[in-house]
Amino acid sequence: MAQTLYTGTGRRKTSVARVRVLPGDGRITVNGRPVEEYFPRVTHQRAVRAPLELLDAAGRYDVVAKIEGGGPTGQAEALRHGIARALAEESPEARGELKAAGLLTRDARAVERKKYGLKKARKRPQFSKR
């Protein structure tokens, strides 16, 4: 018999995390490496574990994720979003808790594009009155 498997896709900025959550002992693997090795910063590790700790499920599930694109913060938050979606799929009661904590909401903020005639997205060239 195949073991139960829950999937979720998380996105943040330009990062996409494809997440699989399965019953286990709490191991989190990202692109074939342990989460502590992949995300050395404690803030990123905390962000990744947030959905599991909210539901007191940290030692009950293993997480296997493949992440593409973006930088470390975008990747960590994409992974958090993917884990939250997978846990919501696993347990409909947990969905309300995750939603209230804002973990199921896709953070739509992204870098604003640069416009022609400007130095950056909004920075204008210096103006000389005379």
Curated annotation (Swiss-Prot):
Classification of source organism: Bacteria, Bacillati, Actinomycetota, Rubrobacteria, Rubrobacterales
Name of the protein in question: Small ribosomal subunit protein uS9
Family of this protein: Belongs to the universal ribosomal protein uS9 family.
Record keywords: Ribonucleoprotein, Ribosomal protein
Gene (UniProt): rpsI
GO cellular component: cytoplasm; small ribosomal subunit
Statement: the UniProt record of this protein carries the keyword Acetylation: no
InterPro entries referenced in this protein's UniProt entry, alphabetically: Ribosomal_Su5_D2-typ_SF, Ribosomal_uS9, Ribosomal_uS9_bac/plastid, Ribosomal_uS9_CS, Ribsml_uS5_D2-typ_fold_subgr
Keyword Transcription regulation: no
A GO BP entry: translation
Molecular function terms from GO: RNA binding; structural constituent of ribosome
